[in-house]
């Protein structure tokens, strides 16, 4: 029975790690030990930031809606409350898009939300 060494699998594993580390600076791109740590950390950042991306976009949409709504004399929270009372079922992404690109249509949505608010 012949002896089996693991040179081929080790080389393949190392190659896979170094391919993932392509474009990194310094020893991170060509030293397997450092590259492995860098690739693992990059994966952790990627996982975390896929979650953060969702929060960031929601915050951006809220800022855009708030800016458009304040020009019409409402606050963001008043507008959202009025929209809920009026039965407007647009999500924040769609409302932000309307506010940016279709100002007249968004102003009509604001008017509906204003009308649904109780007079204070």
Curated annotation (Swiss-Prot):
Give the CDD domains listed for this entry: Ribosomal_L20 (cd07026)
- Single GO BP term: ribosomal large subunit assembly
Q: Name one GO molecular function term.
A: rRNA binding
Pfam families this protein is in?
Ribosomal_L20 (PF00453)
Q: Which UniProt keywords apply?
A: Ribonucleoprotein, Ribosomal protein, RNA-binding, rRNA-binding
One GO cellular component term of this record is: ribosome
Q: Does the keyword RNA-binding apply?
A: yes
Taxonomy, superkingdom: Bacteria
Biological function: Binds directly to 23S ribosomal RNA and is necessary for the in vitro assembly process of the 50S ribosomal subunit. It is not involved in the protein synthesizing functions of that subunit.
Q: Report the family membership.
A: Belongs to the bacterial ribosomal protein bL20 family.
Q: Which HAMAP family match?
A: Ribosomal_bL20 (MF_00382)
Q: Which PANTHER family match?
A: 39S RIBOSOMAL PROTEIN L20
Protein name per its UniProtKB record = Large ribosomal subunit protein bL20
């Amino acid at each position: 029975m012949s002896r089996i060494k693991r040179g081929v699998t080790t080389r393949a594993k190392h190659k896979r790690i170094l391919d993932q580390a392509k474009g990194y600076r310094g020893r991170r791109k060509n030293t397997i030990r450092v590259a492995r740590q860098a690739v693992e950390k990059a994966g952790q950042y990627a996982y975390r930031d896929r979650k953060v991306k969702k929060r960031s976009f929601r915050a951006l949409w809220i800022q855009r809606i708030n800016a458009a709504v304040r020009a019409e004399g409402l606050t963001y929270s008043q507008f959202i409350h009025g929209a809920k009372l009026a039965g407007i079922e647009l999500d924040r992404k769609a409302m932000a898009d309307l506010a940016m690109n279709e100002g007249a249509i968004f102003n009509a949505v604001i008017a509906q939300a204003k009308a649904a608010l109780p007079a204070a």
